[in-house]
UniProtKB/Swiss-Prot annotation:
The gene is dnaK. This is Chaperone protein DnaK. Induction: By stress conditions e.g. heat shock. Signal peptide: none annotated. PROSITE patterns: HSP70_1 (PS00297). The keyword ATP-binding applies. Keywords: ATP-binding, Chaperone, Nucleotide-binding, Stress response. Belongs to the heat shock protein 70 family. Acts as a chaperone. GO terms for molecular function: ATP binding.
Amino acid sequence: ARAVGIDLGTTNXVXAV
């Protein structure tokens, strides 16, 4: 998610990879 930059909200909160 972080690499794609689509799940910004999820990556920030859940910190999903």
